[in-house]
Every structure is written in C-alpha cells, then in structure tokens.
C-alpha cells in the first residue's frame, strides 16, 4: 500500500470555451443556463493515517443519462447523477441529510442546483444544507456569470481552499462532497448526442470525528 497519494485536477476557461463552445473572439451571447469554466486547480494528499481531515465513506457513482443535449446546460445533465449517488449513500448508510453540516456538489451551478434539490424533494428529501461549488466560486450579483462556475478545477479549488480548512478549524464536522462530471467529447456534443453524467461521493470528517483515512 502506498504511503501517500496525491490527487489533483485543474481546468482553464479559454481552453474549455475553444474546445466545447465558441472561440472568445467570436463574441457569442451566452444562454442563462450557461456556466463559466473556472481557471482553477486543487490537490489533496491522502495517507492511511494522520491528523488531518478524514474520509469516512465513499460511494462510487453510476452513469445517468436523461437525454440532455444542450452543452450550455451542463447543470441539468449532471443533477440526476448527483441526486442518484446521494440517495444511494443515504440508503446504504441509513443516514439523513440533516446529520451533516453541508452537502456540497461539484459544479451544478444555480440551475443544476435547483434541479438537484427538486429531484430529491420528489423522493421526500428537503435539503436545507446544500451548497454547490459552482455557485460559491463567483459572485452571482457582482459578476455576470449566468449559472455560475464549472469545470473540475472549480470543485477542487473550493474543496481545498474553503471546505477542508473549515473542517480543519472545526467550523464544520461532517460534510458530504459530491464531485460531478459529464461524459462527453468534442465529437459527441457536435453530433447532438445526449450528455451522460456521473457523480462520486466522499464523506469528510473533522479530525475529532474521523474514523479512517485522512486527507
């Protein structure tokens, strides 16, 4: 077994725009559901034991595809995957949402977050402690970012720069973190194929709550 593993990811605004939308010089008008890919990064060091924030449980996601084809509405494509993973975790662990200080999704944005809560409400779960990295990263009122931030660097930056420090300081004790991702390519979206999505979950615990590995 390795003594330590470093997990890292990043994303870049201009690169994502050029590959999946339109070149910046084109000046295309964004739809209200569109998100802004974050130029951001984050890295976590995982060890079998230590004094840091602990990982108490993990739930691997399953691919969900509800037929969303709009590349400018990624939150709607990913929300069902996040909802399905959270429901499986709560069922498997026999826990309730209110037992956690926060349930944080990766980059659903404002539109996707609303859909996420609506999907769970249909299953009888009313989330009062849900936050989304895509909604937290930018100032929705002061910046014209439409539905918020997106990209793997978005959730990595919020996790490493905001959530983990709060757990370290005991500002929070138990947090569910759901990374969200879309499974597409430059070819599939141009062919107007549907956008499958997946979401993996980790339960993070402050040092005094931990019972397992550490980050």
Give a label for each model feature.
Residues 12-26, 112-114, 158:
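Active-site-adjacent elements of ketosynthase-type condensing enzymes
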Residues 9-12, 105-108, 179-182:
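Short, well-ordered beta-to-alpha junction loops that form the rim of enzyme active sites
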Residues 108-123, 187-194:
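Short glycine/threonine-rich loop-to-helix capping motif typified by GTGT followed
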Residues 13-18, 63-67, 184-186:
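Short, well-ordered, mixed-charge alpha-helical segments that flank or form enzyme active sites
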Residues 99-106, 176:
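Short glycine-rich phosphate-binding loop at a beta-alpha junction
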Residues 1-11, 18, 43-49, 150-171:
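Active-site-proximal alpha-helical scaffold in enzymes
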Residues 22-87, 92-95, 129-135, 141, ...:
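Condensing-enzyme catalytic core mediating Claisen C-C bond formation in acyl metabolism
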Residues 1-3, 12, 16-17, 61, ...:
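Conserved catalytic cysteine-centered active-site region
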């Amino acid at each position: 077994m390795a003594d330590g593993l470093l997990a890292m990811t990043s994303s870049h605004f201009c690169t994502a725009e050029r590959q999946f939308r339109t070149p910046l010089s084109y000046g295309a008008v964004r739809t209200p559901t569109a998100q802004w890919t974050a130029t951001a990064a984050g890295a976590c060091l995982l060890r079998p034991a230590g004094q840091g924030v602990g990982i108490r449980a993990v739930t691997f996601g399953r691919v969900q595809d509800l037929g969303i084809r709009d590349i400018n509405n990624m939150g709607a494509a990913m929300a069902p995957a996040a909802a399905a993973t959270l429901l499986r975790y709560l069922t498997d662990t026999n826990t309730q949402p209110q037992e956690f200080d926060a349930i944080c999704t990766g980059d659903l944005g404002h539109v996707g977050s609303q859909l996420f809560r609506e999907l769970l409400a249909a299953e009888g779960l009313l989330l009062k402690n849900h936050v989304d990295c895509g909604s937290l990263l930018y100032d929705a009122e002061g910046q014209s970012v439409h539905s918020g931030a997106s990209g793997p660097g978005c959730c990595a930056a919020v996790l490493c720069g905001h959530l983990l420090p709060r757990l370290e300081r005991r500002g929070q004790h138990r947090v569910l973190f759901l990374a969200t991702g879309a499974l597409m390519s430059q070819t599939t979206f141009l062919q107007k194929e549907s956008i499958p999505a997946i979401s993996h979950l980790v339960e993070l615990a402050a040092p005094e709550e931990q019972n397992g590995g550490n980050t």
